[in-house]
Structure formats: structure tokens, C-alpha cells
């Protein structure tokens, strides 16, 4: 939309102040900070909110540490996470050769917030998120010495130069436990080059680590899938069921320090027990090389776009009909994630531009028969519990249901980002007014939304849903901004933009 000259809009979120005091103890990491926030707020606690980190503790955190914390704000369901652009940020940009781009951005002295949560960094201990949710958090100490079969260090959450150097310090001169497979994926070409230059990469290799390509890899099941029934300790941000590529595996989320210590011992280990000095001096100048960046052509509109057979057209949506009818194609429990809705693993990632192919796998982790039934029925409705669409902002989790002609999702509650994506694609997100009505629906019930176009156009927030099979009606809530009303009426954002040109 922005590329076509339009605007990016969202509902104004509330702001939660995460006030940090104290300083992290040795062996306690930024990952433990965000795991503590998840423990407090849960995976639903950030919906409709911006997380703003303030307080004297913020000054003790480097930019990579702040990035780790902000990265997992998505697991809270938050709109975004904010740290101040202060002198720490300026020093980081200077080291990257970009100080000229620095702009100071600090909270006003009299800033007020919708809520405040205080966390004393000095009181934190190493934490671990147990399977299969990032908010299933315990201390490493109380969890005990769980035997580890695999340790994976990296991902967009924990793969910075700072993270990698601490891992290298722990591994240097030691050997990975014989029962553990250790894989390390540095987070960028820059980080990998610096590790190779200073010898840290060799320390990892000599300890027994396998070095993986810088990529969206093991976190999403692209390689390193654990063996059957394995325990895998990982530094990524999500441990949803089956996401690793092995449904029977247990994925535990930990810091880099905990992961490296556990790789040596063979069991979940508190890194504070190590004698290693984990101090890392951030370089005054990072190794940066832009020689592989391909600059856009001056006449960009004249560039030829080559589409192979795996690049299929964008699914087309119809304008909202006067009345919608269809079967309840699937009934789901709470916390259905975007991984459930549209799995994304080594088998499916090559088809990200091929929605018809991806449709064959939509919601198959819940019910393998769903895609075939949805196509045979010509579309219909989905019934869901709380927090439907939890997880990332994966647009395919809305694009593929659009292709399957899903007309609406009736749920107890929605994850914010996914709800917005449904609206963007013309799919109605309806919330049960009385959660008990969820129990009255079953698969194959015939559903009708009478006069739905008239209701949406009139800004009506209470939408009656008729169950024609069982002969009852219940009330659902449909809260849309005027702009979102236009999107739903047009059949999605793209249709709306086209109609305005």
C-alpha cells in the first residue's frame, strides 16, 4: 500500500511502560528479560499495546540486547516494542559507520502510560520456556537437569556479535557433550565475518559445533529437525507444537549462555555455574561491506519482472455479498497459531509465492482433511477459541483462507495482527458475545449471516449468526474502524485501493 502511495493505518494502541531497574547478573541475559515479561503478561498480554522500555536499567543494555527483547514482543501479541534512541544507540550506529543517521528519541520527562510493570534486572535468574508456548516460563533452577539431545543457537532473536562471542567464550577449549548435537547460526554476514576474523568461529568448530547458514532456519523447521521424542534447547523465539519439523520433539527456549552451557554438560544447565568470564567488549568499528547490495534501477518501472511457474497470481476476493452462507468447516481450541493455519517448513517455504499449492496444507496440523473439505464445500466458516491467529504477522495465514473462500472466522478472541490481516483480505473476524455459544456449534453446521453487507455498511457492531442446522441464532461482535468497514465491503484492502484509483 505504501509503495502505491497509500497510507499505513492501525488502531491507536495503548502503551505499557516496562520499567527496568538494576543490572543483569553474570550469566543472566536479555533473553531472560523478555521471558520474564512473557511470564508476567502471557502470549495474549500485549494485544493492542506498545511495549515501551524505560528506567535506569535500559542504559545497561546494549543495542543487540535490546533487539533480543524487542524481537520477542511479537510473542506477547504486542503491536511493537520501543527502546529509546540514546547514547548506546548512537555508539552502535557509529560502530556501523552510520552515525550520520542517528536521531535522538527519548520519552518526555512527563510521559504517562496506560500501565507500568517494574522489573529489577538484578533479581532475574536464567529462565526457560517449556513446550509448547513461549509464556510457559520457569526458572532453569526449578526445571532441573533435563537431558538435552540437541542445542540450537542463533535465529533472529539471539544471533548478534555479542551473543556469538559469549557462546564462543563458553565453548573455547572445551568439547560438546557426546550425546548433544550443537548447531550455531550466526545472525548476519557481518557477524559471521567478524567471528571468522577474530578466531571465535574456530573456537566453536573445535568444540564440536556445526555452523549453519545465516538464514531463517532451524527456528521454522528449515533443517536441524530434532530426532523423534528429542529435547531441543533453542535460542529462538517460538516453540509452538511441531514448528521444529518434529511433532514429537520438546522445544525449550533459553538464552545463548544457557544453551552453550547445556551443550557442554548434556543437561539443562544454569550458566551462572560456569567460571567463564562472559564480558564482551563491543568493537569500536564493525566489519561492514555493502558490495553485494544491488541498487534499484533508475527507471524502476521499466524493469522486467520474471515469473516462473511457481509464482502464481494473487488470490482474488469478491466484494461482500448481501448475505453469507456456508458450513462450519472446522472447530478449533484456544491459541491456534499462524503455524497451525499456514505451516511454514522446509517442504512449504519454496511455495510462498504459490498460494494454490499452499492451500493444500492450510490448517492441516489441526485437521488433515480440511483443505479438501473446504474446496469441496466452496468455502465456509471457521469456529475458534481464544487468541486465534497467535504468533507472527504471517500474511499467508490470511491469504490462503481467502483462496479457500473462507468467509469469516467466529472466535472467542483474536490475536491483533492476524485479525488485521483477515480484515485486509476481506474475511470477517467475528467474536462471540457469549463465549458459551462456542459450544453450540459443530463441524458441518450450516451458518448464515443475513443482511451482512447492510450491517457492515451501517457500522453495526452486533452481528447475528444463524445456525440453520440447529435452528438457533447467537450474537457476535464485529468492531471495525470506518476504513476497515470499507475494506470488508470491497472484499479486502487491495480491492479498496483499486476502487479508489
Task: Tell where the protein language model's regions lie, with residue ranges.
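Fe-S-dependent hydro-lyases/dehydratases of central metabolism
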Residues: 1-501
Amino acid at each position: 500500500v505504501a509503495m502505491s502511495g497509500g497510507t499505513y493505518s492501525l488502531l491507536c494502541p495503548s502503551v505499557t511502560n516496562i520499567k527496568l531497574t538494576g543490572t543483569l547478573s553474570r550469566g543472566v541475559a536479555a533473553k531472560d528479560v523478555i521471558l520474564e515479561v512473557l511470564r508476567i503478561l502471557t502470549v495474549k498480554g500485549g494485544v493492542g499495546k506498545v511495549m515501551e522500555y524505560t528506567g535506569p536499567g535500559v542504559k545497561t543494555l546494549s543495542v543487540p540486547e535490546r533487539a533480543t527483547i524487542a524481537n520477542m514482543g511479537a510473542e506477547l501479541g504486542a503491536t511493537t516494542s520501543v527502546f529509546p534512541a540514546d547514547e548506546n544507540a548512537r555508539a552502535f550506529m557509529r560502530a556501523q559507520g552510520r552515525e550520520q543517521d542517528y536521531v535522538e528519541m527519548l520519552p518526555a520527562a512527563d510521559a504517562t502510560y496506560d500501565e507500568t510493570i517494574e522489573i529489577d534486572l538484578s533479581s532475574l535468574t536464567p529462565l526457560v520456556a517449556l513446550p509448547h508456548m513461549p509464556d510457559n516460563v520457569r526458572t532453569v533452577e526449578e526445571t532441573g537437569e533435563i537431558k538435552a539431545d540437541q542445542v540450537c543457537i542463533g535465529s533472529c532473536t539471539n544471533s548478534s556479535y555479542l551473543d556469538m562471542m559469549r557462546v564462543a567464550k563458553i565453548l573455547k577449549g572445551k568439547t560438546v557433550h557426546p550425546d548433544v548435537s550443537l548447531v550455531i547460526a550466526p545472525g548476519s554476514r557481518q557477524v559471521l565475518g567478524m567471528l571468522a576474523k577474530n578466531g571465535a568461529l574456530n573456537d566453536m568448530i573445535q568444540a564440536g559445533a556445526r555452523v549453519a547458514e545465516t538464514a531463517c532456519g532451524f527456528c521454522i523447521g528449515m533443517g536441524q529437525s530434532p530426532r523423534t521424542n528429542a529435547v531441543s534447547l533453542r535460542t529462538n523465539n517460538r516453540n509452538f507444537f511441531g514448528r521444529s519439523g518434529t511433532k514429537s520433539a520438546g522445544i525449550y527456549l533459553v538464552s545463548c549462555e544457557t544453551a552453550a552451557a547445556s551443550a557442554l554438560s548434556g543437561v539443562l544447565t544454569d550458566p551462572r555455574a560456569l567460571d567463564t568470564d562472559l564480558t564482551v567488549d563491543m568493537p569500536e568499528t564493525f566489519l561492514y561491506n555493502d558490495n553485494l547490495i544491488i541498487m534499484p534501477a533508475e527507471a524502476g518501472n521499466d524493469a522486467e519482472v520474471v515469473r516462473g511457474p511457481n509464482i502464481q497470481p494473487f488470490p482474488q476476493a469478491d466484494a461482500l455479498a448481501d448475505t453469507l452462507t456456508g458450513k462450519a468447516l472446522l472447530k478449533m481450541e484456544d491459541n491456534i497459531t499462524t503455524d497451525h493455519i499456514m505451516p511454514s517448513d522446509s517442504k512449504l517455504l519454496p511455495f510462498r509465492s504459490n498460494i494454490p499449492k499452499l492451500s493444500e496444507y492450510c490448517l492441516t496440523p489441526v485437521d488433515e482433511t480440511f483443505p479438501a473439505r473446504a474446496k469441496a464445500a466452496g468455502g465456509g466458516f471457521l469456529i475458534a477459541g481464544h487468541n486465534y491467529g497467535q504468533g507472527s504477522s504471517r500474511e499467508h495465514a490470511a491469504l490462503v483462507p481467502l483462496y479457500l473462500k473462507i468467509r469469516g472466522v467466529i472466535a472467542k478472541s483474536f490475536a491483533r495482527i492476524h485479525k488485521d490481516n483477515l480484515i485486509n483480505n476481506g474475511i470477517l473476524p467475528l467474536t462471540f458475545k457469549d463465549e458459551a455459544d462456542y459450544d453450540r456449534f459443530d463441524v458441518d453446521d450450516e451458518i448464515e449471516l443475513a443482511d451482512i453487507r447492510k450491517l457492515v455498511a451501517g457500522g453495526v457492531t452486533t452481528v447475528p449468526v444463524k445456525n440453520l442446522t440447529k435452528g438457533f441464532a447467537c450474537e457476535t461482535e464485529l468492531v471495525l474502524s470506518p476504513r476497515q468497514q470499507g475494506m470488508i465491503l470491497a472484499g479486502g484492502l487491495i480491492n479498496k485501493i483499486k476502487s479508489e484509483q
